[in-house]
Amino acid sequence: MTAAVWTLLLAYLFGSVPAGVLVARTYGVDLRKVGSGNIGATNVLRALGWGPALVVAFFDVFKGGIAVLVARAFGLSDWMLGGVALMAVLGHNYSVFLRFRGGKGVATSFGTLLFLDPVLALWTFPIGLSVILLTRYVSAGSMTGGVAAFVLSLALGRPLWEVATVFLMALLIFWTHRENLKRLREGTERRLGERVEAR
């Protein structure tokens, strides 16, 4: 197989590593059976607190970044870089280690963007964070961040491959948050800081 195919496969496998599940397991907790059942840092925060959540967030961000670094090391084209970024996110969302189930892909999307375009990532981050702090809804901040990244990629005149990559990542974020959107409309969405019983 070519370097491009190998890199796409590696990106998917990097993304598939379920840090949340692995960290929670060290505490004797099955993360898929507590809170929202999601494997990401937000559910780890609800179940186990800030320390484990930050470890998971760090890992989920940088596994996306590592995939991009590997692609650059192989000298792949810009469009392939975008493909590698998306494969890392898809790996997180549909992990081969979890029977093709997974998380929502926000941290991994941010990680890939941070290594693809640090300026765009660092413009996007405070926008999403502000919404989270104002509303205490992580889901709302995540979706706002996805939209902001796409709009900013257009406003800053980024190349087509990058705009397309960011657009697809934003679509994936909305897709994985479809149940959150429903709960937001119904007023039943959990807010940041609400704890759940870890078991």
UniProtKB/Swiss-Prot annotation:
Q: How does it sit in the membrane?
A: Multi-pass membrane protein
Task: List the subcellular locations.
Answer: Cell inner membrane
Q: Identify this protein by name.
A: Glycerol-3-phosphate acyltransferase
Give the pathway annotation.
Lipid metabolism; phospholipid metabolism
E.C. number(s) listed in UniProt:
2.3.1.275
UniProt function note: Catalyzes the transfer of an acyl group from acyl-phosphate (acyl-PO(4)) to glycerol-3-phosphate (G3P) to form lysophosphatidic acid (LPA). This enzyme utilizes acyl-phosphate as fatty acyl donor, but not acyl-CoA or acyl-ACP.
User: Where would you find the membrane-spanning parts of this chain?
Assistant: 3-23, 50-70, 78-98, 113-133, 154-174
The residues the entry assigns to the signal sequence are none
Which family is annotated? Belongs to the PlsY family.
One Gene Ontology cellular component annotation?
plasma membrane
Give GO terms for biological process: phospholipid biosynthetic process
| GO molecular-function terms, A-Z | acyl-phosphate glycerol-3-phosphate acyltransferase activity
| Enzyme class, spelled out | transferase
Its recorded reaction(s) are: an acyl phosphate + sn-glycerol 3-phosphate = a 1-acyl-sn-glycero-3-phosphate + phosphate
Q: Which PANTHER family match?
A: GLYCEROL-3-PHOSPHATE ACYLTRANSFERASE-RELATED, INNER MEMBRANE PROTEIN YGIH
Quote the subunit structure annotation.
Answer: Probably interacts with PlsX.
Primary location? membrane
Q: Which UniProt keywords apply?
A: Cell inner membrane, Cell membrane, Lipid biosynthesis, Lipid metabolism, Membrane, Phospholipid biosynthesis, Phospholipid metabolism, Transferase, Transmembrane, Transmembrane helix
